Amino acid sequence: MDEGTKFQITVYDKKDKVSGIMDYVVKEVSENSATMFYEMHDEKGKMITSSEYGITCTNDGITIDFSSMMSPELLGQYEEMEVEMTGTDLLYPNNLNVGQSLPDADVLMTVKMPPLNMKMNMNFFNRKVEGNESITTPAGTFDCYVITYDSEAKMGIKMTSSNKLWLSEGYGMVKQETYNKKGALIGKSILTAFEK
């Protein structure tokens, strides 16, 4: 990824209505790492939150900072508070193969609200490369690997979902769909602009 690369992910709800727009820019690229900065706006253009996270390239593949796994809407709710995060980074190997299993990832977020601490745990597991597919979005046509995984969020109650991700070399996420445990689509994200 080159410094200054910009891209946009549009988030849709289960009724296919825009629920948010995320604008990303690649900042501070070094030999084997980069910082991603993003701003999230609601469907009316009002800024909800902004944040950044790191990406590292190694011989094993690309690792994405575990903090990126927390939803921007959630982070926006706690931006005035002291938040601690620990976890395991998300790894995408350099050479993906259909049928390949990918390592699990997790993040634990602790929000300090004296006298209490609130904890939220997010796990990504059963990550697997299911196939290859070419898909077209407003940003263009992309050859993608299709990756499926399950996610589990725990904050008092446990919420599980299954996900399907279309990942393209040199571009990253092109599309993602999220399903509830009954298999109904509850949301999707699509790459709607990309500018190098």
Label the predicted regions.
Residues M1-S51, C57, M109-K196:
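Acidic, serine/threonine-rich low-complexity disordered tracts
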